[in-house]
């Protein structure tokens, strides 16, 4: 069973997560989730859960605090830059529309939308937090994760212009997945790298499987 993002979220699509340690009340409770996993396992059915790590809701407590206080420890959990910082491209458009949104005299980065700001994947504390999130759901019996937007942990215009984005993405996923598999070797990972097959190929060095969008489009 592949479950889409079941976490609390203020929107219909659920990509803007406000709490990574709970279940959206529209779907039930954590006890309901545990029962689902237990009943699935009794029937030799594995459960794969969507894991949206690249970004969080702009209503997530960490982002709210980082927005209200530039000196907060959570400020470095997201990508913030001063408006006169020329090491960033504030006009970058990795998807559709500008990725940088202005708040007072600062900008924050959200590749998909200003309502889902990107996390700072270069921050070791963020990496540890995300490893802990995965561990939490593994402890509840989850057998694998579908990684959303895997290539956007390091995206166009998000970090210093000199970075090799592919290398940084692979390094990030190697660290996080190793952290997970240290306690569950048979954890299965499938990722969404929405790109051509040639661009997806390098991710097999870090991930168990990837969606083949070229094949899907050709069928």
Placement of each model-derived feature along the sequence:
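Active-site and adjacent substrate-binding regions of carbohydrate-active enzymes
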Residues: 1-219
């Amino acid at each position: 069973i592949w479950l889409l993002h079941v976490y609390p979220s203020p929107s219909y699509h659920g990509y803007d997560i406000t709490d990574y340690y709970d279940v959206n009340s529209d779907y039930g409770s954590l006890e309901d989730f545990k029962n689902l996993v237990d009943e699935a396992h009794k029937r030799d059915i594995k459960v794969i859960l969507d894991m949206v790590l690249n970004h969080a809701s702009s209503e997530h407590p960490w982002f709210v605090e980082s927005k209200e206080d530039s000196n907060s420890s959570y400020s470095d959990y997201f990508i913030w830059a001063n408006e006169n910082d020329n090491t960033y491209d504030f006009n970058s458009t990795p998807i559709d529309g500008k990725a940088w949104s202005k708040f007072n005299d600062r900008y924050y980065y959200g590749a998909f939308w200003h309502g889902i700001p990107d996390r700072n994947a270069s921050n070791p504390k963020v990496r540890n937090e995300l490893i802990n999130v995965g561990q939490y759901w593994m402890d509840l019996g989850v057998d694998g994760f579908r990684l959303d937007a895997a290539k956007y942990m390091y995206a166009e215009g998000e970090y210093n212009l000199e970075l090799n984005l592919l290398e940084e993405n692979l390094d990030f996923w190697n660290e996080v997945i190793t952290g997970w598999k240290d306690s569950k070797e048979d954890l299965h990972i499938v990722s969404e790298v929405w790109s051509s097959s040639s661009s997806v190929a390098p991710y097999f060095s870090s991930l168990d499987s990837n969606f083949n969008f070229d094949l899907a489009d050709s069928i």
